[in-house]
């Protein structure tokens, strides 16, 4: 059947042309280098299997190989020391008008407190044990209990702890005034978020206020990332950058790099031309971390990539990219290696 052969030939030619015109080498190598974004700073790793918004992540951590907790000053500073070029922090408004760093809507999972974070004053939060609820054995032992009293920090303390490190402020809309309070707090602290290179992850409803307060700042929502990424997966092969990516953000999972036209150099050039940003994430699959959490994964990031690499385990990824930051002793090396093997086998 000649018409079938003609269609097949036409499709083959179209595919070849599309591949050639989108070749990465057609764009000059971008300036810069991969920038590690440490998710919550240094944090304890936990199982994502069956994870939901109501799951207590602190109750399912892996056997700890370090003593750092997420959204704490020691955790932020250690992430900085391990080569994080940016740190994601979780924003929570308190009952007395302050901004704290805390991931959950309620205190019950991680701390010895109860109720909503927004109903507690900063003084009440500082009195809590931030490591109270962490367990790796179903509640038989709690390795951080009693060791993190007073560890829930204010935003101001975090800014002072890592003053030159760009922060990605994660707003979940826990309270209606979360965004205006954060804006006020940043301005009161004299933080030049654009100059420092800060960013904002927030619900769509909050982006306009953030961009109005800080013109030119990097700001995105989960929905806007999905829109840009999905649109580019089709229009990119037609050599077009979709409108959804203008001043937007695209996410490239490690295991789907092949699906993005012009990856990496051509895609980066296209996104830069429309004021966009590019994030490399961990493999896209059920039960996996959003960010990189195995040291070998950093080798899958193209050497010419100059955007953000989302990292869940900066303890291992940092030294994998920046060997000079590795100051683990022999015991820590052995425990880390064992933990990584358990993590790998869990995904087989």
Model-derived regions: residue spans:
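Phosphate-group recognition and catalysis centered on beta-loop-alpha active-site segments
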Residues: 2-348
């Amino acid at each position: 059947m000649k018409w079938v052969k003609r269609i097949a030939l036409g499709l083959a030619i179209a595919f070849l042309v599309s591949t050639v015109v989108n070749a990465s080498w057609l764009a000059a190598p971008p300036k810069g280098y991969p920038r590690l974004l440490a998710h919550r700073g240094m944090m304890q790793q936990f199982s994502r299997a069956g994870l939901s918004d109501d799951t207590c992540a602190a109750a399912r951590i892996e056997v700890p190989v370090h003593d750092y907790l997420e959204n704490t000053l020691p955790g932020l500073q250690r992430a900085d020391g391990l080569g994080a070029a940016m740190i994601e922090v979780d924003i929570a408004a308190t009952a007395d008008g302050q901004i704290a760093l805390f991931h959950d809507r309620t205190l019950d999972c991680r701390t010895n407190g109860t109720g909503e974070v927004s109903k507690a004053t900063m003084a009440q939060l500082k009195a809590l044990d931030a490591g109270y609820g962490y367990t790796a054995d179903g509640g038989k032992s709690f390795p951080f209990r009693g060791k993190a009293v007073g560890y829930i920090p204010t935003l101001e303390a975090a800014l002072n702890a890592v003053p030159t490190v760009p922060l990605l402020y994660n707003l979940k809309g826990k309270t209606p005034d979360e965004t205006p309070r954060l804006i006020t707090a940043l301005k009161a602290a004299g933080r030049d978020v654009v100059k420092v290179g800060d960013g904002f992850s927030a619900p769509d409803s909050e982006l306009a206020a953030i961009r109005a307060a800080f013109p030119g700042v990097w700001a995105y929502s989960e929905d806007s990332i999905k829109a840009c990424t999905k649109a580019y997966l089709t229009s990119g092969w037609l050599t077009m950058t979709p409108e959804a990516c203008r001043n937007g953000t695209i996410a490239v999972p490690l295991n789907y790099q092949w699906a993005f036209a012009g990856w990496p150099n051509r895609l980066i050039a296209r996104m830069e031309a429309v004021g966009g940003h590019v994030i490399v994430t961990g493999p896209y699959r059920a039960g996996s971390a959003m960010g990189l959490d195995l040291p070998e994964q950093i080798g899958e990031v193209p050497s010419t990539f100059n955007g953000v690499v989302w990292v869940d385990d900066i303890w291992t990824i940092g030294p994998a990219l920046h060997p000079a930051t590795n100051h683990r002793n022999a015991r820590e090396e052995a425990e880390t290696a064992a933990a990584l093997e358990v993590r790998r086998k869990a995904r087989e």
